[in-house]
Amino acid sequence: MKKMLKVGQIVNTHGIKGELKVTSLSDYLERFEELEWVYIQGYDEKYYIGNIKYRPTTVILSFEGYDNINIVEQFKGKYVLIDESQRRELPEDTFYKADLIGLDGYTVEEVYLGKLVDIIQAGSNEVYVFRDKETNKDILIPAVKEFIPEISLEKKRITVDPIEGMIE
């Protein structure tokens, strides 16, 4: 099966003409304009994007052939997905969250921290959550260059340069 990426979550219907209110999971709100079609979690078919409207915190989407609220209500709560062929090319040193989850974290001194299990949005920065499988302890590291000097998808690892007291 293809690896799918979440680009939004359908939070509700909008009006009676089959429009859906979607919370974008992309840093690039206009992402949906680049897509001809998407998948919906739990369904195998492609859904071709009709209209796109922007609201302050959401995107209003409609799909071709889905012009009635009764048809689209089943999608509430589902994720809007794309396959890897639809990925945008990212700038250097920028990564998809889905590619980072599961990478091993090591300090610059080669001390194993655990696997990256979550990425939390905390204000203007993200925070990486590493979990040590043996102790089940979470270690939170701000995802800034000062503390994360290297990420290697090829080596499947993230290098952390913590300050004193950050990891204990």
Swiss-Prot record:
One Pfam family here: RimM
Task: Check the UniProt entry and state the signal peptide residues, or none.
Answer: none
A GO CC term attached to the entry: cytoplasm
Which InterPro entries does the record cross-reference, listed alphabetically? PRC_barrel-like_sf, PRC_RimM, RimM, RimM_N, RimM_N_sf, Transl_B-barrel_sf
What job does the chain carry out? Answer: An accessory protein needed during the final step in the assembly of 30S ribosomal subunit, possibly for assembly of the head region. Essential for efficient processing of 16S rRNA. May be needed both before and after RbfA during the maturation of 16S rRNA. It has affinity for free ribosomal 30S subunits but not for 70S ribosomes.
Q: Which HAMAP family match?
A: Ribosome_mat_RimM
Supply the name of the protein. Ribosome maturation factor RimM
* Biological source species: Alkaliphilus metalliredigens (strain QYMF)
